[in-house]
Amino acid sequence: MKGKLAVAIIWHMHQPYYKHPQTSEFVLPWVRLHASKDYLHMARLLNEFPTVKVNFTMVPSLRDQLEDYARGADDEDTRVTMRTVEGTLTPEERDHMLARFFSIHHGNVIAQHDEYRRLLQLALAARGRPELLSDDYFVDLALWFNLAWIDPDDIAGDDRLRDLRDRARRFTREDVHYVIGRQRFMASGAPHLYRSLERDGRVEILTTPYYHPILPLIIDSRSARRADPSALVPDPPFVYPDDALYQLEEAVVSHVRGFGVKPRGVWPSEGAVSPEAADAIKKAHIDWFASDEAVLGRSADLVFERDDIGALVHPQLLYQPFRLTNGVTALFRDREISDRIGFSYGAMSPHDAVGDLIWKLEAARDRLPDDGGPYIASIILDGENAWEAYPNNGNDFLRTLYGTLAADERFETVRVSDFLDAHPPLVDLPNLHTGSWIDADLKVWSGEPAHERAWHVLERTRRFAQEQWGSLREMPPSVRQPLMVAEGSDWFWWYSSRNSSPEDRVFDELFRANCEVIWWYAGAEPPDELKQPLLDAGRIAAVAGESGAMLPGKREGYG
């Protein structure tokens, strides 16, 4: 093609819902920490590139948690951090700090700060005997952990944070309070900055089903067998299509409340779609959705051939919008480029990484017919976790990427809805495969024994709630919310044998707790199966053995 190739970058912002339904306290700190490291900074970085346009998702349940922190909510790690300056830590809290407060990339963060590295070495030397470490040690560790989770640019731009980084030790109560206060400010500021950027035409904000459920599985859990006929599915099946629609409708309501406009696009949780999910998107009055190229391949019986550098040989098969039979528009991400950013480019220099990305786009553009298209390359991935694998929190890569795209006349970054307004889809997609961004199936969330146990107790709890109160829409909020939370994808992600973290037991407990409160609200005793872990026995033993500091080389499955 001779004109500019439109490039749609979509950064997905999501964390599980960490608020415990029985205590209303946050049991894990990752929303607060990612607000300090990613959410605010990813939006603020665009101020340096006024011609670059980007798309973001912000899951409604994530924005709820950010607002809670802005109003003064705490998590366990905040409270432990504050207690270090009182010198009143219990032995259990000291153990907890040694297990949690090195949970950040060792090579790209801890190793870059001599004092933080020294604290890790002392922790290793004192393994199993935290009483060997002084009260001052834990004050310094608390501040370093929280400081290290703040974006390096924000530290450099704040005189006091920069002074704390350079001083490196002997921190005070005032120092600790200042760092936590800055994190709270960042959580407060992030949604407002996104709203401002969208109002100025710089970004488009997509939505996601409210508590991040896998729509096809909420609609009918048997749909997992469409991509994998041998998948284990719960018996009786989980079949609540109106729950899926309600998760979408409430996401739209939340989006209007938070950002002042109705969302036009949606990234279905994990890019998981099905014909029925597309119909729910239509009913929620959302114009378009995005998923993965492999879903398109299975839908249209296409194979996306790539050359030696990973560029598409026939990019016109992927780089365009598609019109479904119900009128909804679909885009599908370039998996090669998206996954390179997410999993590979962090090990390369920014110059080489961006050069590789542009090389792929350039080759694809040169192969596109000069027929007016419309052609659009979609790059879609996690907008927070990827940067932990990059030096300097990915800032050097992002600046190089945005600067290169802004200067290269062959490409134009776009807000997706702007592009679709100017270039409606010309190609029909009569069939839509049921699958997600991972292998075009739903195996990560359904199909294993632990999955089956979790879906079974969720179905039993959902059926009980239906008998007590009727549909999800008719339930009292104190029942409806934990049920919607329990329908979220994250619990099932961690029940998969593919995924593990030091927090596996916490995720299991949160899932069961959200189910339990529904029974209690009705004055009923929860079933026995909710009173014991749903994880496989081997996983429980493995997680129980992961104590002490997170060591270099161990799986870094945090946040």
Regions found by a protein language model. Name each.
Residues 2-166, 305-558:
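Active-site and substrate-binding clefts of carbohydrate-active enzymes
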Residues 57-62, 209-212, 265-273, 417-420:
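Short, solvent-exposed turn/loop segments enriched in Gly/Ser/Thr/Pro and often Arg
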Residues 165-187, 191, 294-296, 301-304, ...:
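Extended, Lys/Arg-enriched charged tracts that mediate electrostatic binding to polyanionic substrates
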Residues 181-212, 221-222:
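Structured, charged N-terminal subsegments at the starts of enzyme catalytic cores
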Residues 199, 258-259, 275-290, 395-408:
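Short, surface-exposed basic-aromatic patches at helix termini and helix-loop junctions that form
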Residues 275-279, 283-321:
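Active-site-proximal helices and loops of the catalytic beta/alpha 8
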